[in-house]
């Protein structure tokens, strides 16, 4: 099974280890993943089993050589894990991850490449919208889709963490006023239904 593991700063609950695997649920329980507490022994077991080049893949997923398809698959599975959906993504092998900010950034070319990938996943506002507003709108739309599909609102903190994970690689984390903007967009979108 192909598997890549990206280490974040440490193993405390405030920091995360990001996993990409065929089915991470077979390695760790959902509760452990969602709490962000991955014990050192579990990681050692995982690494000794997989025997994969961790450093090389960490560089790849830090923004170097990131293809459009990889970006789409990554975003789909981040949402899959955050919203705790039971269905498996049909677009690729499951890549499941938990995450937190880490300060990695990429250059402008990679930001644009990744942004265009994410935008293909959602119906967007007219082209007059700014890039920032488009990203926020995409987050709001995904939240509304989840509400309609599962009959409950997703945890906004998880939505924000998903966005912040992407932004630590491709830009800057969401500001407080932008978080509120996403919430207001969700309310407006729900009223239109």
Swiss-Prot record:
It comes from the Viruses. Modifies the subcellular distribution of heterogeneous nuclear ribonucleoprotein K (HNRNPK) and may contribute to modulate HNRNPK functions related to processing and export of mRNAs during ASFV infection. Necessary for virus internalization. This is Phosphoprotein p30. It is found in: Host cytoplasm; Host nucleus; Virion. It comes from African swine fever virus (isolate Pig/Kenya/KEN-50/1950) (ASFV). Phosphorylated on serine residues in the 115 N-terminal amino acids. Oligomer. Interacts with host HNRNPK. Keywords: Early protein, Host cytoplasm, Host nucleus, Host-virus interaction, Phosphoprotein, Virion. GO terms for cellular component: host cell cytoplasm; host cell nucleus; virion component. Induction: Expressed in the early phase of the viral replicative cycle. Belongs to the asfivirus phosphoprotein p30 family. Its main location: host cell.
């Amino acid at each position: 099974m192909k598997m890549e593991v990206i280490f974040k700063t440490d193993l405390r609950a405030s920091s995360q280890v990001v996993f990409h695997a065929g089915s991470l649920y077979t390695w760790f329980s959902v509760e452990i993943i969602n709490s962000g507490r991955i014990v050192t022994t579990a990681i050692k077991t995982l690494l000794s089993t997989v025997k994969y080049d961790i450093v090389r893949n960490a560089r790849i997923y830090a923004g170097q050589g990131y293809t459009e398809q990889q970006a789409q698959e990554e975003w789909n599975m981040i949402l899959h894990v955050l919203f705790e959906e039971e269905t498996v993504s049909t677009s690729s092998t499951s890549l499941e991850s938990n995450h937190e900010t880490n300060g990695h950034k990429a250059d402008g070319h990679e930001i644009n490449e990744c942004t265009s990938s994410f935008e293909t996943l959602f119906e967007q506002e007219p082209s007059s919208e700014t890039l920032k507003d488009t990203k926020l709108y995409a987050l709001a739309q995904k939240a509304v889709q989840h509400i309609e599909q599962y009959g409950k609102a997703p945890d906004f903190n998880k939505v924000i963490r998903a966005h912040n994970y992407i932004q630590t690689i491709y830009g800057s984390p969401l500001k407080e006023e932008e978080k509120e903007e996403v919430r207001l967009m969700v309310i407006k979108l729900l009223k239109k239904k």
